[in-house]
């Protein structure tokens, strides 16, 4: 297995995984957004999977849509577990603002083990995004900034 991180400069984090004849590219974009009404104290992860027609002829046309949905649903269930990723660390202001991580997964080559390779690629890209333990939300005049904890006292309400 080969894992490369920080391979797409226009993303917040990225990874490329090659497992035998399977190759997957993952990019993560982080944006501020609103938390879901059912989880006002947590951030959100949203997965999008694209099965490239170049990966296998079976993906031409609408051939890869069912597989893409299945992989997306599997990842959504896996990351809904607090021990996998603490989405509470993505909360900026409870009920108002959180980080939304958009995880885009592109299947470049399909040689089997798609679920395993996708899981590893997503985990590597999320770890490449940033370390949430080292960041702190700060509000100035209603705007949110994230700064390293070592450079500031952490607080979550504006003065």
Protein language model regions, located:
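Polyanion-binding surfaces on beta-sheet-dominated domains and ring/shell assemblies
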Residues: 1-159
């Amino acid at each position: 297995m080969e894992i490369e991180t920080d391979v797409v400069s226009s993303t917040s984090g990225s990874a490329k995984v090659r497992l035998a004849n399977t190759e997957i590219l993952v990019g993560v974009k982080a944006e501020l957004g609103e938390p879901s009404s059912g989880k006002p104290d947590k951030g959100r992860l949203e997965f999008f999977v694209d099965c490239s027609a170049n990966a296998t002829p079976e993906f031409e046309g609408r051939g890869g849509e069912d597989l893409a949905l299945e992989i997306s649903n599997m990842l959504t269930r896996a990351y809904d577990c607090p021990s996998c990723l603490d989405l509470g660390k993505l909360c900026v202001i409870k009920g108002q603002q959180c980080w939304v991580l958009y995880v885009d997964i592109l299947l470049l080559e399909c040689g089997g083990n798609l679920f395993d390779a996708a899981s590893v690629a997503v985990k590597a890209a999320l770890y490449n995004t940033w370390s949430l333990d080292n960041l702190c939300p700060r509000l100035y005049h209603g705007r949110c900034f994230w700064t390293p904890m070592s450079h500031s006292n952490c607080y979550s309400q504006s003065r």
